[in-house]
Amino acid sequence: MPDHPLGLTPLARRCIAAGAILMLCGVLLGAFGAHALQAQLTPRQLASYQTGVQYQMLHAFGLMIVGIVGQVTGASPRLRWSARLMIAGIVFFSGSIYLMTAGAPRGLGMVAPLGGVSFMAAWALLAWHVLSPTLSGIAGEGARKGG
């Protein structure tokens, strides 16, 4: 039984908390971009920055989904790696965009595809976990009942 007052497993607690913190940071970065950076950046730079914020928000929410799935089905190496890769994707993809917008060398843009691949792998691992017929808990019961 989980040792958390809300009954959350360690994976669920970490993923939901990290996702919420990354969402908070995404809101702050989005507001900063809309108010402080709008006059400083070209329209293309601002669009790129906003893409970084959007991807951060989407994948922070994805990280929270990983935590919820882990709470329902139990943790697995696939879920743990999905969470790690969501975070890595945010750091590499969104982080490189933020840094380039702040004036970092354009060569840093070569890091962004690593973030994109991390995002894709994270979603694939989450799908694999959910579709796995060997899951315990609710998903396993549904598979045994033909659902």
Where are the language model's segments positioned?
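Helix-boundary and loop/linker segments of multi-pass membrane transporters
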Residues: 5-12, 39-42, 74-76
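Interfacial segments of alpha-helical transmembrane regions
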Residues: 7-23, 78-86
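Hydrophobic alpha-helical segments of small multi-pass membrane proteins
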Residues: 20, 83-97, 112-127
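Core segments of alpha-helical transmembrane spans in multipass integral membrane proteins
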Residues: 21, 25-31, 47-72, 86-94
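Interfacial helix-loop-helix junctions of multi-pass membrane proteins
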Residues: 34-49, 95-117
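Membrane-interfacial alpha-helical segments at the cytosolic side of multi-pass membrane proteins
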Residues: 60-73, 121-133
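Juxtamembrane helix-break-helix junctions at the cytosolic face
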Residues: 67-79, 101-105
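Glycine-biased, low-complexity coil/linker segments
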Residues: 140-141
